[in-house]
């Protein structure tokens, strides 16, 4: 199993396929295993790199290291270990935070950026309020109820259960107290850690904002607003999908992502 070294920790990653590189970055309810519906489709034409973000899955670290700067350094360390200088970043939720921060701080490493159901750690009142409400309801709903759309829960119960099982690979699901994990999430989105809204005008790489029509955390109307701030960006709305469109509607999301990369990525 390959690991990359970064800031005193070992980061688990996998590489498969050949072609221009794509780095897949999971959300806070998942890990590298969650991209199983993307890899068979992308790998015939792309080098696909998945990783367990620090504190998730096999990238073991104390929850006190849950920090966006660490995540960016880790992503670059994984690319270096894989021998990749430049990649398209596909980030879901938390992974989108990492993608945006990397695009701003290290534009030479990012060929394109696709933010999937991500509030982007942006200092936007509607997005911050949605995240705060999600923390309040954390104990009242299961991971699949919080992250998947109503249509998917009603029609794909088996895959919804698989989503929950993938999450259970993470220490946050079984060995970290809710209060400690919630504090880590809140700390990562502290006022001094947020990305200013006006920073979006500095994003230089081709950018896609993809969102599920039923996403309770990332409203479509806010994504339309952010699209206006990211020069040349595109918006894709996935019908009847919640906060995990890539998992709920993989065929549609894969088509949108591959088309975007083919047309816009600067590998």
Locate each region found by the language model.
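Short beta-strand/loop motif that positions the catalytic acidic residue
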Residues: 203, 209-211, 215
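Catalytic active-site module of serine/aspartate enzymes centered on a nucleophile-bearing elbow/loop
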Residues: 232-267
